[in-house]
Amino acid sequence: RDSVVNAARAVSVQVQSAIIQFSSNFQMALNPQITKTYAADDYKMMHKLIGRSSKFTFFFLLFLSLPIMIQTDFVLTIWLKTVPDYTVTFLRIMLCTTIVDSVANPLMVAASATGRVRLYQSVVGGILLAILPVSYIILETGGDPNSVFIVHLIFSVIAFAVRLFIIRPMIKLDLSEYMIILGRIFMVVCLSLPLPLLYHYYRDCLLYTSPSPR
């Protein structure tokens, strides 16, 4: 079982790394501007850049990841022929985690720009380090390998929220404005998922119910 899980994780990490590379290149243009506007005390423009970076990164990654997440079996079968167990679920959860971390990245850049990162790194780093013992406990108590990646996703969301509240006073961020951006992101998710999921479900129903050729 361990070898199957390791193979599944290796495949998932390969795909995740490619997606992360795309998002890093996309954000690279805005990151120096976030630092520059903080140095110039132009908080208003800095907040706009953080919002734009979070929003556009999310849209870009959703555009790349959604087809893969919906058609994971199909994509992996074409690529690998024989897909290791757990790979489909691992990859889907890891892509969700990647999107959360990428949306949070502008906040990390803003924290670095202030130079006051001790509290930020201690708290956020502590949250992320907790993934390891929590995952170990879950596995020791009979948890499924998928649970490790679910734990990672949950802790990434928690770390995102904590980042936001720690950084908010450091850069004078209007929390309500940023929450509006997150609300729009959530709305896009709600609007973009139903049709692809319905199509995927309908196609699978046709495949499983169609009579086999004689």
Predicted regions and their residues:
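Helix-loop junctions and terminal segments of transmembrane helices
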Residues: 12, 16-54, 108-113
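Short alpha-helical transmembrane segments in multi-pass integral membrane proteins
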Residues: 49, 53-69, 124-128, 146-168
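Interfacial/gating helices of multi-pass transporter permease domains
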Residues: 1-17, 85-89
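Membrane-interface junctions at transmembrane-helix termini in multi-pass inner-membrane proteins
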Residues: 95-128, 142, 171
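Alpha-helical transmembrane segments
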Residues: 110-113, 165-179
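Alpha-helical transmembrane segments of multi-pass membrane transporters
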Residues: 119-145, 155-166, 184-201
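Conserved small/polar residues in nucleotide/adenosyl-binding loops
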Residues: 208-213
